[in-house]
Amino acid sequence: IPSIDQEHLSLVLGKHYVISFQDRIEGDVFDNLRKRVNNPKSRLRKFRSDYLFYALIDSVVDGYFVIMEFLKIRIDDLENYVLENPDQQVINQIIAIRKQLTMIRKVVMPLREAVDRLFSDESDFITEETYLFFRDVQDHISHLMGSFDGFRDSVGSLTDLYMSNLSNSLNVIMKTLTIFSLFFVPLTFIAGVYGMNFQHMPELGWKYGYPMVW
């Protein structure tokens, strides 16, 4: 399962500016946004700084939707693998996805709190029109949280299904071993009887005794 890269991001909104602080500036969720900024006809060049501030946060949220779609596909694939071939590799992937979901939730929660705080504090730098855009971002984050929680439940169900299939496989093996052991019970009994050191065993003098045992 591919790893999910993390990066620290800070945004500062002023009346006529937005300042961003991040670890790297290439290959991130803002690549498409940079192209829009460089386009003279782009809405980002015509609107105020608060709209750019919104666009940056919206790009981050959209990036999580890409991750969500990827994880959905992986969970669906793992469900088929668990049913067909519940081996150790499958449970390792289930554990890896569960860790990723936990990590993502820890990252999305502060973002949700930050967006909620924009509404409770009502910044003078954000217009009423831009607040409507932020309302959509708020809804998208809530949808993300619900989806990731649902995925976490699905991963828990996959773990239970894996353990159930593994238990069934062990039961089949035990039944097979039991059948083989029942087959050897008479042989073990005969070997035990004739392995005893009794002084008088009449059948030992029978000429067909040895062939009958074999």
Regions found by a protein language model. Give the residues of each.
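Peripheral, non-transmembrane regulatory/ligand-interaction domains of membrane transport proteins
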Residues: 1-128, 133-136, 140-145, 150, ...
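Hydrophobic alpha-helical transmembrane segments and their immediately adjacent juxtamembrane loops
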Residues: 139-214
